[in-house]
Design a protein with these regions (language model features):
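Hydrophobic alpha-helical transmembrane segments of multipass integral membrane proteins
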Residues: 2, 39, 173-177
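N-terminal membrane-insertion alpha helix
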Residues: 2-23, 160-163, 183-184
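Membrane-proximal N-terminal soluble sensing/regulatory segments of transmembrane proteins
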Residues: 11-99, 110-131
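Alpha-helical heptad-repeat coiled-coil segments that mediate oligomerization/polymerization in large
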Residues: 121-135, 139, 143-167
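Selective recognition of signaling/oligomerization transmembrane alpha-helices
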Residues: 149-196
Length: 196
């Protein structure tokens, strides 16, 4: 019984670590996406203000925000990539996500450079939405993968709980049989001969 409980606890600890890592991956990727969207929004606002001939200081503030967001997104994405990938499917998904991130990040970098050099036509025709959509597809795939990991961990934990409960009940039944047998044997071999 103790061996089975130890096995279940060890298995649950491994699954808990797996769930924790999955949640960290989800958080890092979600933060990366949020910061990239923040950079994109700042660039779009700066582009609009540039087209409307607003003062350079207003535009410069937005450009600083966009550049800072792009730098922060790189740091966040590196932390995401530093987390170990499990099976071959997850490693392939990680590589695809890395490619789509690099493409989206590069498109935003180019857009910022074009805006800083006042090339509005290049800024407006940058394929940022396409690269963002590609990243979002990978982002959603990660969400599904992490949900799958969480569901599998939950199902396995439930199975371990049921096995532990079955072993515990079995041990109680075996103990009751042993005690009943011992009482019967004591009565048959010790108490009944003394009654004569």
């Amino acid at each position: 019984s103790n061996g089975m409980s130890f096995w279940a606890f060890r298995d649950d600890l491994q699954r808990l670590n797996q769930v924790e890592q999955s949640n960290q991956q989800r958080a890092a990727l979600a933060q990366t996406r949020a910061v990239m969207l923040q950079a994109s929004t700042a660039l779009n606002k700066a582009g609009t203000l540039t087209a409307l001939s607003y003062p350079a200081d207003d535009i410069k503030t937005l450009m600083t925000t966009a550049r800072a967001s792009l730098t922060q997104s790189t740091t966040l994405f590196k932390s995401f990539m530093a987390m170990t990938a499990g099976n071959e499917h997850v490693r392939a998904l990680q590589k695809e996500t890395e490619k789509s991130f690099a493409r989206w990040h590069n498109d935003l970098e180019h857009q910022a450079t074009w805006l800083e050099s006042n090339q509005l036509s290049d800024f407006l025709t940058a394929p940022v939405q396409e690269s963002q959509n590609a990243f979002d597809v990978n982002f959603e795939a990660w969400q599904l993968e992490i949900n799958h990991v969480l569901e599998a961990a939950s199902a396995q934990s439930q199975r371990n709980y049921q096995i532990s409960a079955l072993v515990f009940i079995s041990m109680i039944i075996v103990a009751a049989i042993y005690i009943s047998s011992a009482l019967w044997w004591t009565r048959k071999m010790i108490v009944q001969p003394l009654a004569i």
